[in-house]
Amino acid sequence: LKLVEEKRIEPDLAAAVTVPLNAVPWRDLANQAATLLPLPVSSDDQPLPSLGSLLKMRGNAANGQKLFASTGTCANCHVVRGQGKEVGPDLSEIGAKLGREALYESILYPSAGISHNYETHVVILDSGTVVTGIIASQTDDELSIKAADALMRTFKKSEIEQMEKQNVSIMPADLQKVLSPQDLADVVEYLTTLRPSPK
């Protein structure tokens, strides 16, 4: 927190520690974190409840499933059991991989922990065209980039003037602006139900 106060911390790192520091059990430290690293604002323009408060909320998985496919726009980039678009990781079994706290952190701060092979790259072509997305595949001669709209774009490597990996996730970091705290709780509750099918 001292580094934050002195403005000596990278924005990506600050985002990564915001939720954990707001959730610490020591009141003085949590209050200081709330001042220096406030939680994002929700769809009703109110500060989001603390992570501890969100974890205590009861979610409705059925409503969460509807939100996942509509208002939350999650299905625009994630596949669940064959439904949705494959831009980000497949979430069909995410409930067996992440607990509720980690799910909240992944939604609120997607850049804090980007899954391997889902790093965002910015590609600048010699024509001046700029394309941002995830590397879908590459050969010695060609590179295929999948953009946030799930469209694939393939270029000859000889056309690429510059390519840089970004520290920012392609996933929007402001989903809480379209989801209320209860909506978030519902989506997380739905995600916890996504587990491998019994054999």
Where are the language model's segments positioned?
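Gly/Gly-Pro-rich "capping" loops immediately C-terminal to redox-active cysteine motifs
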Residues: 83-108, 121-165
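Feature representing long, continuous alpha-helical segments
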Residues: 31, 62, 72-75, 85, ...
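Sec/Tat-exported extracytoplasmic proteins
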Residues: 71-72, 78, 107-111, 179, ...
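Post-cleavage N-terminal segment of exported redox proteins
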Residues: 1-59, 80, 190-199
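C-terminal capping alpha-helices of c-type cytochrome domains
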Residues: 32, 36-40, 129-131, 135-141, ...
